Curated annotation (Swiss-Prot):
Lineage top rank: taxon: Bacteria
EC annotation from Swiss-Prot or TrEMBL: 1.11.1.28
MF terms (GO), sorted A to Z: alkyl hydroperoxide reductase activity; disulfide oxidoreductase activity; hydroperoxide reductase activity; peroxiredoxin activity
Protein name stated in the entry: Alkyl hydroperoxide reductase AhpD
Bilayer-spanning residue ranges: none
Function: Antioxidant protein with alkyl hydroperoxidase activity. Required for the reduction of the AhpC active site cysteine residues and for the regeneration of the AhpC enzyme activity.
The entry's keywords: Antioxidant, Disulfide bond, Oxidoreductase, Peroxidase, Redox-active center
Record bears the keyword Oxidoreductase: yes
Disulfide bond entries: C132-C135
SUPFAM superfamilies listed in its UniProt record: AhpD-like (SSF69118)
Catalyzed reaction equations: N(6)-[(R)-dihydrolipoyl]-L-lysyl-[lipoyl-carrier protein] + a hydroperoxide = N(6)-[(R)-lipoyl]-L-lysyl-[lipoyl-carrier protein] + an alcohol + H2O
Source organism (scientific name): Acidobacterium capsulatum (strain ATCC 51196 / DSM 11244 / BCRC 80197 / JCM 7670 / NBRC 15755 / NCIMB 13165 / 161)
Tagged with keyword Disulfide bond: yes
Family: Belongs to the AhpD family.
Length: 183
């Protein structure tokens, strides 16, 4: 089921979310199609909502190459690990943790096969969803060093915020209407 169909199932209280999604997708001027749909896919995966993730992957396959779709998945997977690890370092009052090696494999960050700016945008979007300030700062810095402007960065975060909200509404509706969730 495409995301547009999922959007039709959102209740009235999510009207702003629906309108924001429509505007972001149909009137996007800042992001390339690959940047937009990679951000949608990576962000949907980060919400952990099955319905939204399946819809985003379906739509993503229409707009992204297989390699870009896989790279968006890589960004979501690696950030789900890194965001926890580096958020812990950031939040812990024990400064020693920040000096210790991560010892976590992250080869996908180098071997994803898409434009580095695109992959960084997707990583930034997932990091914003997962609330890792250290990761947000790191990815934003790399993006700026690669020539990305604040408008591009904020456009990706805007997409992430709306996708996250869609996932939250879908989860709330599962709880509100358990019989629908079982179908």
């Amino acid at each position: 089921m495409p995301i547009d169909t999922v959007m039709e199932t959102l209740p009235g209280y999510a009207k702003d979310i629906k309108l924001n999604y429509s505007t972001l997708v149909r009137q996007n001027t800042e992001l390339t199609p690959q940047q937009l749909w990679g951000t949608v896919v990576a962000s949907a995966i980060a919400t952990r909502n099955d319905t939204l993730t399946a819809a985003a992957l379906e739509d993503g396959a229409q707009h992204l190459s297989e390699q870009a779709l896989e790279a968006a998945r890589i960004a979501a997977a690696l950030m789900s690990m890194n965001n926890i690890f580096y958020r812990f370092q950031h939040l812990s009052s024990n400064e020693k943790y920040a000096t210790m090696p991560a010892r976590l494999r992250m080869n996908g960050m180098r071997t994803h096969g898409v434009e580095p700016v695109d992959f960084e945008l997707w990583s930034l979007a997932v990091s914003a969803i997962n609330g890792c300030g250290k990761c947000v700062d790191s990815h934003e810095k790399v993006l700026r060093e690669k020539g990305a402007g604040e408008d591009l960065v904020l456009a990706a975060v805007r997409v992430a915020s709306v996708i996250h909200a869609i996932g939250a509404v879908l989860d709330a509706e599962k709880v509100h209407q358990p019989e629908a969730a079982m179908a």
